[in-house]
């Protein structure tokens, strides 16, 4: 699996995501750069994740981040197509100190740019800009699509140690149902694809923990499932096997982790979260689905 390039870069590795050109900044902590972490942006509404870094690649942390979007392949690439305010994602985990998310809709394919104005406290505002591409269609299940009715391994086929790399293992309720079984129930479903022990972005464990906390509040009204990215995590933890991606991950055509999907009671994708999504952000979408 390919971890979110922006986080790998923020932690000292990685070269950026395909089609993305990082802001060229001098190696100065007083400057700023931004990186787009999403690998599957397409026409229509999207949740976008950005790494907000100083000039030497360290996370700037919680800041007021305002974004402007430009369609560089459009008739007038200088026209601002939309403006949004980004949301800081790092209050719950140190691994997400660089990360901010926003909701934005794209009306054309091709090359786009995002410009960030970053202000922390009373300090001087910093600006940074980067480019990314928008596809016609998402490669992975998108909002409005029917969720794949995957028949994944569960506690009926395997002990929990083979179903998750989380140690100690967490709530067994996350491993009792297949996705197909959960979709047959008349209630929503949250599916977390993550590998807590082997995540390149260091946010898979916190992502699963966020879902487990939400299950304590909403587990009587909806289903929760965790899909470990790799087969036999018990043997991977002791270096006895090479990593093999689970069939469920291939079913959903995922290329990054963590990836979280919220499915409504009709079996359609109501929301999706590439990369880390804190519990409060997930909860907003859950509340909307439960109220619909």
Regions found by a protein language model. Give the residues of each.
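C-terminal motif of bacterial Sec signal peptides marking the signal peptidase cleavage site
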Residues: 7-10
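Bacterial signal peptide processing site
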Residues: 12-15
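Contiguous segments within soluble domain cores/interaction surfaces
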Residues: 18-163
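Thiol-/selenol-based redox modules, centered on thioredoxin-like
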Residues: 140-141, 148-159, 269-292
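Short active-site neighborhood of thiol/selenol oxidoreductases, capturing the structured segment around
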Residues: 159-162, 171, 179-200
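Residue-level recognition of beta-strand->loop/alpha-helix junctions
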Residues: 194, 226-228
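Typically the conserved alpha-helix immediately C-terminal to a functionally engaged Cys/Sec
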Residues: 201-218
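Thioredoxin-like thiol-disulfide oxidoreductase module
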Residues: 219, 229-257, 262-269, 287-291
